[in-house]
Amino acid sequence: MEVLEGLYYSKDHEWVKVEGDKVYIGITDYAQHSLGNIVYVELPEVGSELSAGDVLGVVESVKAASDVYTPVDIKVLEVNNSLVEDPSLINNDPYGSWMVIAELKDKSQLDKLMKADEYRKFLEEE
């Protein structure tokens, strides 16, 4: 499983990429691999304000449906509609296939997430 440096990871297998006061959020390589071929993606409304732990969207594969949670408090600025049109993009490039770009409400919440090394150890224990 690929784990990229420079990202933050949640125990629910979401990744967060920080660029200034904005964050990109998607699901990890482990998550897409566990789900299998992704056939449907549901994204939040632009402007939605979500707290850490809230459902960000839904990803469905031929074998399972899984809620995607926001790991941090956010306001959704943009959604990646290309994933709705072609959900398999997540299988092909999980770290390039962000689900939302959002305003990060509280940067200190990033400290509760795992860095790449911690996430790799977490996966070994899964």
Curated annotation (Swiss-Prot):
<dbReference type="GO" id="GO:0005737">
    <property type="term" value="C:cytoplasm"/>
</dbReference>
<dbReference type="InterPro" id="IPR002930">
    <property type="entry name" value="GCV_H"/>
</dbReference>
<dbReference type="InterPro" id="IPR011053">
    <property type="entry name" value="Single_hybrid_motif"/>
</dbReference>
<protein>
    <recommendedName>
        <fullName>Glycine cleavage system H protein 2</fullName>
    </recommendedName>
</protein>
<dbReference type="InterPro" id="IPR033753">
    <property type="entry name" value="GCV_H/Fam206"/>
</dbReference>
<keyword id="KW-0450">Lipoyl</keyword>
<dbReference type="GO" id="GO:0019464">
    <property type="term" value="P:glycine decarboxylation via glycine cleavage system"/>
</dbReference>
<dbReference type="Pfam" id="PF01597">
    <property type="entry name" value="GCV_H"/>
</dbReference>
<dbReference type="InterPro" id="IPR000089">
    <property type="entry name" value="Biotin_lipoyl"/>
</dbReference>
<dbReference type="GO" id="GO:0005960">
    <property type="term" value="C:glycine cleavage complex"/>
</dbReference>
<dbReference type="InterPro" id="IPR017453">
    <property type="entry name" value="GCV_H_sub"/>
</dbReference>
<comment type="similarity">
    <text>Belongs to the GcvH family.</text>
</comment>
<comment type="function">
    <text>The glycine cleavage system catalyzes the degradation of glycine. The H protein shuttles the methylamine group of glycine from the P protein to the T protein.</text>
</comment>
<comment type="subunit">
    <text>The glycine cleavage system is composed of four proteins: P, T, L and H.</text>
</comment>
<feature type="domain" description="Lipoyl-binding">
    <location>
        <begin position="22"/>
        <end position="103"/>
    </location>
</feature>
<feature type="modified residue" description="N6-lipoyllysine">
    <location>
        <position position="63"/>
    </location>
</feature>
